Amino acid sequence: AIYRRRLKWLLAVGLLHGTLLWFGDILTAYALTGFWLLRRAGESWPEIRQSVKFTVLVNVGLLLLMAIIMATLTNMEDYGAETAAEALLANDISTNGGWTEVTKARIDDFGANLSGFLLFGPRIALLFLLGVTAVHLGWLTHPERHRALWRRILLAGVFVALPLNVWWGYEALSWALEPEMDSRSVHMASLVLELAGPALAAAYVAVFMLTGERIT
């Protein structure tokens, strides 16, 4: 009951945040995924493991689908011009528009963001399930027993995931400053970020696990 109330509160805050402050709100997606995970409470470890395997397959399929969609869009002659025009219009509204115009645009963008939940929702579900797995296997509760694992995760994050995240940041900033430029590279970086982002987050967790181990 407490967890359900917290999810409802998170959903309410996410909806307000997405419509009034930032259309890229992630709290709503977290809440919706949390309700899905709540239905799996009490499952046995074999059932959870099957859910993890299924969610991995779904995410692999979605990643391939996104790659095909991006390749198709970026090869369209007028796609770059349309994308640049949309970015310039959004920038004009956010900097010169009144409160009503900005709010309307933000609500429209938030609705479009939520419509993509079927694409990024499974990724969040997989991360949640990996958290459950990490607790069940003792990776989080007994990190001292899994030093080698956390060190490998940290090394992968620093030497692989971090450079890829920096590359995405560079491409995203370049495209934001010059939206009329070719968007192929930023879309490629965004696709890579689907894997590099969670990998870097896992490296952050590894830092806490290894540091906390030394403190205790």
Show the residue positions of the predicted features.
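Alpha-helical transmembrane segments of multi-pass membrane proteins
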Residues: 30-35, 125-128, 195-206
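Hydrophobic alpha-helical transmembrane segments of multi-pass membrane proteins
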Residues: 19, 23, 114-125, 191-199
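Structural signal for the C-terminal ends of transmembrane alpha-helices
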Residues: 39-45, 132-143, 208-216
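Long hydrophobic alpha-helical segments that form multi-pass transmembrane helix bundles
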Residues: 54-132
